[in-house]
Amino acid sequence: MQKLIILLLVAAVLMSTQAVLQEKRPKEKIKFLSKRKTDAEKQQKRLCPDYTDPCSHAHECCSWNCYNGHCTG
């Protein structure tokens, strides 16, 4: 009888730990499956100024224009 009680307690502990681990998995999957920026996107973010930053040529503003010394959208 005592062995049966111990076996049931061990089974209950294992099931509860499995349930706790499964609760954490969806968050990890969401984080893993979320869109990550490519190296090119990270590089462009570093190279491209804000659209209000000063400039002297349009190529300094990436996809914006340089007008009156500032990047314009």
UniProtKB/Swiss-Prot annotation:
Q: Which UniProt keywords apply?
A: Bromination, Cleavage on pair of basic residues, Disulfide bond, Gamma-carboxyglutamic acid, Hydroxylation, Knottin, Neurotoxin, Secreted, Signal, Toxin
Q: In which tissues is it expressed?
A: Expressed by the venom duct.
**Pfam families per record:** Conotoxin
- Which residues, in ranges, are excised as the propeptide? 20-44
Residues recorded as bearing 4-hydroxyproline in the entry: 49, 54
**Disulfide linkage:** 48-62, 55-66, 61-71
Q: Which residues form the signal peptide?
A: 1-19
Residues where 4-carboxyglutamate occurs? Answer: 60
Example GO molecular function: ion channel inhibitor activity
Positions of post-translational 6'-bromotryptophan modification: 64
Q: Where in the cell is it found?
A: Secreted
GO cellular component terms given for this protein = extracellular region
| Keyword Ribonucleoprotein part of the UniProt annotation | no
The similarity annotation says: Belongs to the conotoxin O2 superfamily.
Comment field on protein domains: The presence of a 'disulfide through disulfide knot' structurally defines this protein as a knottin.
Q: What protein is this chain from?
A: Conotoxin Asp7/Gla(3)-TxVI
What does the record give as the organism's lineage? Eukaryota, Metazoa, Spiralia, Lophotrochozoa, Mollusca
